Amino acid sequence: MSSPRSFFWVQEYFTPWDYTARAVTRILAYRKTPFQEMLIAETGAFGKGLMLDGHWQSTTVDEFLYHEALVHPAMVQVVQAGGIPRRVLVLGGAEGATLREVLRWRSVEQVVMVDIDGEVVAACREHLPEMHQGSFEDPRVEVVIADALDFLQETGPIWDVILSDLSDPIESGPAYRLFTQEFFRQIRSKLQPDGAFTIQAGPTGPVELHQHTRIVRTLKTVFAAVQPYAIYAPTYGGPLGFALAAQDPISPRPEPEQIDQILSQQLDPERGALQFIDGITLLGLYQVPAHLRRAIAAETVVYTLDNPPRIE
């Protein structure tokens, strides 16, 4: 006689016709907050994971791929532009893993994390210590539970790096306004002249790359330099895009030795070595595939508050 099944399947839809299923073995936290539906669970293969509105945000097995790719290109860009990344603003990032990566940099004096959903932040703080690794307790960190737009309107142009670690811009979610031209103009106005901004910019697979190309197109109407790139992390079921934006030039072919030297000089060795990003990896990330370059060049849609991201 077979034993009762000790897991259940959680489906994540990428299009109305395609989904992946992940085995969940234990629910650690579940709730519907005023902003979104949250699940923190143990999975069969990917460790603990955070799901918001039916989409996996990260899992402990491969989150380093995402969070290192989000944080370190922008920090390196500031150094290459002649600046020092002292003050960093994180938008979203409830798991605390983005904080963890920022705090590796010895030059960092202040990190402010702004998240609209205090319930999700509290749940991640309790259930995902593998991700945040105590970063919420670092004296350089301040957590603000607020709308990112409201916070940006009140803060000054003091930030060396701004990182947008937000959930996908679905119409029913809390983040869709934060992918618009108006928001990116606010971001630009709050950066130091040699500052840098990185945003998680949607999937880049051929079936669903329109969101990525439109985010990149929108950024190019605001910033002088924009560098798209993408990673593959199994949690997401396909390639996931980012975009780095700045007013200073961004080299699409960074010298690996120079990047390695910057990382060696700037990162705190007591916080452990990076698992993903180094000079060769960064050079590879910036080599955008031909199909994606063509799609970005052909894109005409600009996201605005009157024409925000929509599910298609």
From Swiss-Prot:
Enzyme class comes to transferase
Name the SUPFAM superfamilies for this protein: S-adenosyl-L-methionine-dependent methyltransferases (SSF53335)
Arranged from A to Z, the UniProt key words for this protein are:
Cytoplasm, Polyamine biosynthesis, Spermidine biosynthesis, Transferase
Q: In which pathway does it act?
A: Amine and polyamine biosynthesis; spermidine biosynthesis; spermidine from putrescine: step 1/1
List each copy of the PABS domain by range.
7-247
Transferase listed as a keyword? yes
* Molecular-function annotations in GO: spermidine synthase activity; thermospermine synthase activity
**Domain of life, source organism:** Bacteria
Q: What is its EC number?
A: 2.5.1.16
**Cellular localization per UniProt:** Cytoplasm
Active-site residue list: 165 (proton acceptor)
Q: Name one GO biological process term.
A: spermidine biosynthetic process
Give yes or no: UniProt keyword Cytoplasm: yes
Reaction(s) catalysed by this chain, per the record, are: S-adenosyl 3-(methylsulfanyl)propylamine + putrescine = S-methyl-5'-thioadenosine + spermidine + H(+)
Q: Which Pfam families match?
A: Spermine_synt_N, Spermine_synth
The entry's spermidine-binding residues are: 67, 95
Give the record's subunit note.
Homodimer or homotetramer.
> In which family does this protein belong, per the annotation?
Belongs to the spermidine/spermine synthase family.
- Give the protein's biological function: Catalyzes the irreversible transfer of a propylamine group from the amino donor S-adenosylmethioninamine (decarboxy-AdoMet) to putrescine (1,4-diaminobutane) to yield spermidine.
| Name the record gives this protein | Polyamine aminopropyltransferase
Q: Which organism is it from?
A: Synechococcus sp. (strain JA-2-3B'a(2-13)) (Cyanobacteria bacterium Yellowstone B-Prime)
